[in-house]
UniProtKB/Swiss-Prot annotation:
GO terms for cellular component: plasma membrane; proton-transporting ATP synthase complex. F-type ATPases have 2 components, F(1) - the catalytic core - and F(0) - the membrane proton channel. F(1) has five subunits: alpha(3), beta(3), gamma(1), delta(1), epsilon(1). CF(0) has four main subunits: a(1), b(1), b'(1) and c(10-14). The alpha and beta chains form an alternating ring which encloses part of the gamma chain. F(1) is attached to F(0) by a central stalk formed by the gamma and epsilon chains, while a peripheral stalk is formed by the delta, b and b' chains. GO terms for molecular function: proton-transporting ATP synthase activity, rotational mechanism. Belongs to the ATPase delta chain family. It comes from Cereibacter sphaeroides (strain ATCC 17023 / DSM 158 / JCM 6121 / CCUG 31486 / LMG 2827 / NBRC 12203 / NCIMB 8253 / ATH 2.4.1.) (Rhodobacter sphaeroides). Pfam families: OSCP. Its main location: membrane. The gene is atpH. Keywords: ATP synthesis, Cell inner membrane, Cell membrane, CF(1), Hydrogen ion transport, Ion transport, Membrane, Transport. It is a peripheral membrane protein. F(1)F(0) ATP synthase produces ATP from ADP in the presence of a proton or sodium gradient. F-type ATPases consist of two structural domains, F(1) containing the extramembraneous catalytic core and F(0) containing the membrane proton channel, linked together by a central stalk and a peripheral stalk. During catalysis, ATP synthesis in the catalytic domain of F(1) is coupled via a rotary mechanism of the central stalk subunits to proton translocation. It is found in: Cell inner membrane. This is ATP synthase subunit delta. SUPFAM superfamilies: N-terminal domain of the delta subunit of the F1F0-ATP synthase (SSF47928).
């Protein structure tokens, strides 16, 4: 890990630990989980939010006011809004995506859950997602939360990352394996 990334992840971990402990002490982990999901989605979808957090053009006060307005508009809990305001005042909003991921991991650990990253060729139906989660739960022995993305280049099938293991049942991977087998024969 490079030094700047290490520093960023260290900063994010400190904010994540603090907001997690505050929410846990107040019994507000469900609200914090909802806030982190909303912030993660907002970060992915909003170039303006990413610019606000990462651009050196904005002064501390501007960042602080803007993030407070964003928190109010999103209806975030007081603990989350105060944490974001503090991060804005310290010019630490650039670590927001790492902090969100860290908090989500802490909440999942607290709940005895693990997250499986699922990439599918087409969106999963609710019943397919439920069956996949049940199958992964049987394998992992813990509740599994699915984080799904769609990648049409897979043609069909799934790629599932669960902890340190990866299961690739995609047509794309099977075609690549056949191509390699044909190269060895011919």
């Amino acid at each position: 890990m490079s030094e700047p990334a290490s520093i960023s992840s260290g900063i994010a971990a400190r904010y994540a630990a603090a907001v997690f402990e505050l929410a846990k002490d107040e019994g507000a982990l469900p609200a914090l989980e909802k806030d982190m999901d909303a912030l993660g989605a907002a970060w992915s979808e909003s170039a303006d939010l990413r610019d606000l957090a990462t651009s050196p053009v904005y002064a501390r006060e501007e960042q602080q006011k803007a993030i407070a307005a964003v928190a109010a508009k999103m209806g975030l809990s007081t603990v989350t809004a105060n944490t974001l305001a503090l991060m804005g005042s310290k010019r630490r909003l650039f670590v927001l995506p790492q902090m969100v991921a860290d908090v989500q991991n802490r909440i999942a650990t607290e709940k005895g859950e693990i997250t499986a990253e699922v990439t599918a060729a087409a969106p999963l139906s609710p019943e397919q997602a439920a069956r996949l989660a049940a199958t992964l739960k049987a394998r992992a022995g813990k509740d599994v939360k699915l984080k799904t993305t769609v990648d049409e280049s897979l043609i069909g099938g799934l790629v599932v990352k669960l902890g340190s293991s990866m299961i690739d049942t995609s047509v794309k991977a099977r075609l690549a394996a056949l191509q390699n087998a044909m190269k060895e024969v011919g």
